[in-house]
């Protein structure tokens, strides 16, 4: 399979553009909800919504407690508008698909209020690799056993 160029320039009527963003957001209370069926569902929902708005998903990873996306968003659309739309619509679609979630999330608020966004310039390949390996890194961190030291004020016995 030929390697896709990282610096492809897109175009609108009178505009040439290459706008890529690394976006990270998490479910409310940072719950580890994205396992098996819900992981596949949110992946399909995010793809669908991005397709509706003409946003290209370059790379994406759904971790148990957050989502990483590398997106190419047209300049006619603000990042904050799109992320708000994406989180709002995906929330409604998740509650529609999984009715029992209403007990875990009050007021149908599925996502945390904020998100992380970073512009991606010439380092698209590095960001793609980071996102692709994010799930493995999270699993490694979950498997670490932390040393529980004794209380330093109790003395040694």
Which residue ranges define each predicted feature?
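Basic nucleic-acid-binding interfaces
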Residues: 1-157
